[in-house]
Amino acid sequence: MGSLLIKNIHSLVTCNGEDRILRGADVYCEDGFIRAIGRGIDSKADITVDGSHMLCYPGLVNTHHHLYQQFSRNLPEVQGFELFDWLRYLYDIWKNIDEELITLSSLTGMGELMKNGCTTCFDHHYVFPRDGGDLIAAQFEAAGL
């Protein structure tokens, strides 16, 4: 994976017990793991990034997702429906989803999550096909999420 050094970060959110925000800190990562946080880190990195205009915060965690719904979430026909009517309408669509749609919708959803800082996601797959959860797990592995 290599190494990454982000120098002089404008604001680094620690999420520690005091909720400290560090100004002008550096972060050094190696093989996907944070190895050092501090000022003036002098490490040779494969990639060095100027963080002076950046906010750095820990990865977000999504504890409730339905990735198979990615391609049916904004259908105009169901906007404004009450929950039961919404579910009845969409179950008619979801009963026909196949392995390819689960794979593609999962990857699309994971891409959106990662783009917006989410590093962990718990997916609730409860519809067809029967082995859909295994397909989604494989996409999590492929995406590194």
Predicted regions and their residues:
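Active-site loop-helix segments enriched in His/Asp/Glu that coordinate
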Residues: 95-145
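Histidine-centered catalytic micro-motifs
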Residues: 58-70, 125
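Residue-level marker for buried hydrophobic side chains located in beta-strands
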Residues: 5, 47, 59-61
